[in-house]
Amino acid sequence: MKYYFAPLESISSYPLRNAHARFFSSIDRYFSPFVSANEEGHYTGKIERDLSPQNNQTLTLIPQIMGREVDHMLKSFSYLQDLGYSEANLNLGCPSGTVVAKGKGAGMLRDLYFLEDFFKNLFLKKEKDFAISVKCRIGISDAVAIPELFSLFNQFPFSEVIVHPRVQKQFYKGNVDLDGFQKVYEITKNPLVYNGDIENAETAHKIMELFPSISGIMLGRGLLANPALVREIRGGNELKEKELKDYILAVEKAFSEEIQGDKNLLCKLKECWSYFAKNYPVSIKGIKELRKAKTMEEYRAAKFRIYSEGEFIPFKGEKEWI
């Protein structure tokens, strides 16, 4: 079984990826936050740095690309190939309203005729040795089109089909649709990867029991809260407080080298702590102070309070759903 770190916009960029790979070397593949295909087929700034092989030497990175113009996608693929990549992942899963309104992300699932034509042209024109995987949801407002959608995927040689069994309208709310995923599982001929609400080892094992032929599991928010989750799934030790603290220090240092200005850095670290804090569920005052911190000094004081006053309880999930 393969285990993947999901692409999470703004947070799973190379500073966090490298820190995670350094402390928890159990991930088979990391996926970059999505990059929008463009007419130039070239990227600068933080996207260029995030995709740079020099910034991803200790891990296997699969760039995720979003777009609906075949020519733009091909230019992005060429850019990636020049960097040494041999595969990209197509984003057909982003539920953001602004993205969907443009017919991108999960919005591409609306028109299967367009999608078929898009895939035909993409596979016809791309370099033969460049692999394409796809990450998608199971529909827009309902899952009634699962048979048509995944039969369509079967017509093309995707290296993997990664499925988050929610519809776009759910965003990340409610439960995943395991009945819907069962239908996908029965239809799909390409290698299939499960993604969605894996927050502990027990849930991962149940998914593998229910769907024994899947080729992998992709983890996102659960892995941000418990960076040792895949190690636990593989039968290793559960997360220890010291390694979490050391990991957080490494994340702080890595982002401080990428982000200019304490204000911007503080925003990023608060975002990270929305997940780290799940391991300190009773440290209510310290967590509130950290959220309100306006300077790095206040941030460090709040973090110290969380550590000194709050009991470390390794995160095991917020709900039982399977």
Question: How should each PLM-predicted stretch be described?
Answer:
Residues M1-I322:
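Flavin-dependent oxidoreductase catalytic cores
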